[in-house]
Amino acid sequence: MQILKENASNQRFVTRESEVNRICCGFNGFQLGERLRRDMKTSSITTLVVNTTTYFFKDTTELIDFKEKRIDLYEYARYGNPTTMALEEKISVLEGAESTLVMASGMYASNVMLLALVPTNGHIVATKDCYKETRIFMENFLTKLGITVTFIDSDDIAGLQTLVNNHEVSLFFTESPTNPFLRCVDIKLVSKICHRRGTLVCIDATIATPINQKTLALGADLVHHSATKYIGGHNDFLAGSISGSMELVSKIRNLHKLLGGTLNPNAAYLLIRGMKTMHLRVRQQNSTGMKMAQVLEAHPKVSRVYYLGLPSHPEHLIAKRQMTGIGGLISFEIDGDLKTTIKFIDALKIPYLAASFGGCESLVDQLATGIWDIPREERLKDGFQDNLVRFSFGIEDFEDIKADVLQALETI
C-alpha cells in the first residue's frame, strides 16, 4: 500500500508501507508525521513561503555533489531561501539586472554594499543630501577603515569630474531623486565620467522606483532600493535590495552571508505581493503627485514647491529625459513660520503624521519637527526650514486629498 500517491509534480519522495514500518521502528507517530510530505511541491499560483532555517539532503552523495558545486541546492537560511530567491529574480527582471540581492533593510543594503566594494583606504564621492544615516555611516564608521569620503552638491558635475580625475575614487553614490528636495543627477553623464576612471556608480533609486526609472539602463553599475517604500508599498515590513551585474552582486552577497542581515521569508512574500500592484499604485501616485504639485504651486499660502515634474524645479529637464513619471512625494514650504506650519499639519484629516513614504496611505511630516533633535542652526544650514513640509501621497482618491489639503490651508 502506498501512503502517499506517487506524483512527481507534487512531491519529491514516495513513502510506502514498508518504509513507514521501517521508520516507525523505535519512533512514535509524531516523529513519523514529521517525516511525511517534506519538500512537497505544489501548483499554487502564489509564491510559497518557505519558513525553515536549514535544508536536508537525501543522502551523502547529494551533499558532496552540492559541496563540490555539481548541483545547486539550499543549505542554510542565511545563505538562501526559495521565497527570497523568487523575489530576487522578480526584481532583476524589473531592473534589467543580471542579479539582485535582497536584505533585511535598505540601510543594511547600502552599508554592506559600501563595505563589500570599497577597499581599505578607498575613496567615496557622495552627494551632500544623501540619507542622513548613510552619511553618518560613511563619516563615523567607514573612516575607521581608512576610507575617505567627499561630499559634493548633486549638481556639481565639475567637482565630480575633478575628484575622479585627481583621486582614485572607488565609488560614486547618490540618491536620484533625493529626499526631501527631489534633486536628481544626470545618470548617463555621471556614469560616463566615473567609468572613464574605473569608478563604480551606485544610485539609490528608492524614490524613482523601477517603474519610473530604469537606472541600470542609464549607465549605473548598481541600483539600490529601500524596498520598504514603493516596491513593497504597504508600510508593513522592512527590506532592501541591490541589483546589478553578477560579478558585483556576488561580492556583496559573499559579505552579506558573513554579516547576516537576512530578509525573513515572510517579508519576502509580502514584498512579492506588493510588487503585483506596484505599477498600479505608482501610476496613481504619479498622477496625484503631479496634480497636487500644480495645485500647491498656484496656492498663495504656499511659498515654494519641490517637485521634479514642475518646470520650476532646477533638474526638471534631466528628470524628463530619464524618468517616465515623478512619483507621489512632494516637499513644499508654507508661507509662514513653525507654528503656522504645525497648524496646517494638524488640520489635515487624511494623511498620517509619520515618517517614511511610498505606501498606500498618505503620510505627512514637518521636517523641522521630524529632526527636532538636530539643532535649528544645523537644520537651516541643510535647507530644512521651519516651514518645510514633506507629503507622501498614497493611493487615495485625488479629489479627496485635494479637498483635505485645501481645507487645511484655509485654517492658516
Swiss-Prot record:
Keyword Ubl conjugation: no
Keywords on record: Amino-acid biosynthesis, Methionine biosynthesis, Pyridoxal phosphate, Transferase
Cofactor: pyridoxal 5'-phosphate
Residues that bind pyridoxal 5'-phosphate: Y76, R78, G106, M107, Y131, S226, T228
Family indicated by similarity: Belongs to the trans-sulfuration enzymes family.
Function: Catalyzes the first committed step of methionine (Met) biosynthesis. Catalyzes the formation of L-cystathionine from homoserine esters and L-cysteine, via a gamma-replacement reaction.
Protein name in the entry: Probable cystathionine gamma-synthase 2
Organism, as annotated: Arabidopsis thaliana (Mouse-ear cress)
